[in-house]
Structure formats: structure tokens, C-alpha cells
Amino acid sequence: MSQSGKNGLTYSDAGVDIDAGNLLVEKIKPAVRSTRRPGADGEIGGFGGLFDLKAAGFNDPVLVAANDGVGTKLKIAIDADYHDTVGIDLVAMCVNDLVVQGAEPLFFLDYFATGKLDPDQGAAIVGGIAAGCRQAGCALIGGETAEMPGMYSSGDYDLAGFAVGAAERGKLLPSGDIAEGDVILGLASSGVHSNGFSLVRKIVELSGLGWDAPAPFASDKKLGEALLEPTRIYVKPLLKAIRETGAIKALAHITGGGFPENIPRVLPKHLAAEIDLAAVKAPPVFSWLARTGGVETKEMLRTFNCGVGMIAVVASENVAAVSAALEAEGETVVTLGRMIARDEGAAGTVYQGTLAL
């Protein structure tokens, strides 16, 4: 027999608070408005987000799409109760994948799933997403908040992001003229970024340190805060360098898999990247992780960015111009190596020198 009247069940009794969802929408509206750009000036709350490509200034665009998440870095945010920056990570993981194809990020949508919705926590997360969108120059045009009791424990949540960008036809990267002798430039990362955090968490567990302990590699910060340093967003400096110099042949976002998995994705089969490990300036966090976890160099290189979050391939005669354009926008640029001939079946990344950890 079904229940009715004041004894009947409600959605709230099942663990879903519609009022909390509505409150969250009101809390995040100012942050969402702050991401408006040409092509996107609507309000959230409709059934779909709109974007006007003509208003964005494109003539014959090719759309480029990417989606990603933040992985178990979220577990540190949850355990440390620090939610302000994981939204930046979410945006970064998507828009950095767009810019490596020469695309300008246009708009972003997020998916936020939780066991029990906390409007203040949700507003902090979406505030970070909006901050990432502002850094990337893309509009946050919509999203989905899913309260799912029974699927997630109270306090737990997961994030997914979806970004769409565009490039004029014929301007996509990588270009078809990558050649032996071309130079590989590395752009410094801000830290661990958003990959390898299952290993990071295992190492922290072995260390016996709590998230509130001073970070051994950054004594002015707590361990949780230091590890949650957001992923660097390279979009605006790279787009400016691409447009000003016209000399960037390829870009690779150094995420899970490190150099050996990510650099070959943008290279022709007959070329390999020769990396001088002595040129890699690994921040102290990586030395601490390697030392504390007894992680071998090979494993570090295929798990973490080790201090290089993005690489660019340019002809040797254009190194100075591209480096100057990037450095003018605040990037730290190092010469990492060069393109060499690659035999059939050989590795797409080879190393010289030693990584200082």
C-alpha cells in the first residue's frame, strides 16, 4: 500500500534535497556570470547552453572537444576539507588538451556528483571551475549537479568536465612539418597537477603525515594544501605564442604517462623525442615523493610530469622567438631536447642525462 498525506515519503526522505540544489544555483550565478565572453552571454538554468561562433570571431572553424576529470586528487580535497581549487584542475585538464591542438577554448560544462549536497562546498567547487574558465578565456555555460545517496558516501563527490574549442581550418596542431633536429621546449608545471595521485596518497600514507602537517617540501604550507596546488593552465600564453610567431609545430600536455606516453602522441612515426633529463628542473615535491616512496626514476617519469607540464616543438631558428613570447606571458621555458630519427618499433621518447631528484 502506498503512503499518502503527511505520512507519505518525500524526495528529501530518500536523501535528495531539491531546495539545496536550488540554493547552490543561486550561490554560483555570480561566478558563472564572471566567465562570460564573446559568443556566450546567457544565464545558467536553461535546458542547454548556447554559444555563437560568429560572435566569437571565427570564419571557418573546426570544433575540438575534450573531457576529463581530476582523479583521486579529489580524495585529498575531501579529506583536507579544501575545495576551492579542484575546479581549476578540472578546467585545466580539459582546456590544456584543447590548446595542444591549436584550439581556443570557447565553453565549458561540468558534472558534479555527490552523496549529499552541501551548497557551500558546491559553491566553492564551482567557484574554482569559474576561476579556471576565466584563466582559459572560456565561458561556463552549464552543468549538472547530481545528488546521489547510496552511490556516494556523505561528503564524497566526483567531478567531470567537458570543454569545446575551435581553430580556423588549416590552423590545427600538430603541423605536418615536424623534422629531425627540431627543438623540444618545456614549460614548467605548478606541481603534481592532476595525475598520479593514487601513488601520491600511498606515499603520504607511508610517511605517516596528516594533511594538516607542514609540507616537507614547502614548509610554509600544510601538506594537503601544497599537494592541492592547482594544475597550470597554459592556454593564453600558448595561444599568443602560436598567433604571434606562427612557429609552434606541436604541443603535448604532459599528464598521466608522463613524457613516454604523451610526447609520441603528437609525433610522426619516423621521429622520436630525445630528452635531456639534466635540463628538467623537478620541483621539491617530486624529490620528496621519490625519496619517501622509494620510487625509481623510470616510474617517476611515466607517472608524473616531473616539473614539465607542457612541451612545444619548434624549429631551431625559432627557439628564441617562441621562448620570448612565452616568457613574456609568465611561463618558465627550458630547452629539453630535440627530434631524432626513429626506427620502426622503437620508443617514441629516449633519454639522455640524469633526472635530479
UniProtKB/Swiss-Prot annotation:
It catalyses: 2-formamido-N(1)-(5-O-phospho-beta-D-ribosyl)acetamidine + ATP = 5-amino-1-(5-phospho-beta-D-ribosyl)imidazole + ADP + phosphate + H(+). The lineage of its organism: Bacteria, Pseudomonadati, Pseudomonadota, Alphaproteobacteria, Hyphomicrobiales. GO terms for cellular component: cytosol. The keyword Acyltransferase does not apply. Gene3D superfamilies: PurM-like C-terminal domain (3.90.650.10), PurM-like, N-terminal domain (3.30.1330.10). Its EC number is 6.3.3.1. This is Phosphoribosylformylglycinamidine cyclo-ligase. It is found in: Cytoplasm. Belongs to the AIR synthase family.
